[in-house]
């Protein structure tokens, strides 16, 4: 990581793993899908790790699930990652976009206030008023940029976006074309270049979400991201992630192993009991691995 990026609170994957990406691209002899930076085997190695090439594992997930996701994107289908909050859906979408496009900067954050111009395009109103609609006055949003440049676009928490705004994706996912009715001639039609696709994420258990239309659902392949089932893997992840956060916070020590083990066991027990119909109060928070990492970080800072 270059010196100017040392003080970033959270460096993007393209910056954090730039050396690994360069190494994989240099050693990649397999054919790449059109518009991709890496082949499918190299993209898999980037996400799941490869000890032979000294590539780190970046997420705990089934290898078969990653392979299905890569095949979905390679065949031009949109990918929808669904699951409970805190299951690393956003991290996984960032890693997939970085492996395919070289970066994951084209991101739409869904929310109740998200509008269509934040997804597709807007206008520089000074130029629009003085010179009328033109390509110079058009301000491209992430979806426009992704189609123009042939890159992956991430749509985080798509179900938090109003239904009528979600459906603006239909034409881009099916016909791979965006119509700009304000312009004339060739500029009024933007055709997607090779490499363009959409990775969306949605929470299955959360408040303030909207149902997706059946038409939009048909244009995505759905992949469920499950919580980490293996205790040892979850403990290792919490330990490594909390240690990295503590080092970033300038804390010289780590959380003791016994404390981490108790923390992870408590979270797992609460998750298991929360799914049962018992007399205990219903949990109002998702006891996810990400939340366990946050608690471990706070414990380390407080100690």
Language-model-detected regions and their locations in the chain:
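Conserved AAA+ ATPase small/helical "lid" subdomain
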Residues: 63, 242-303
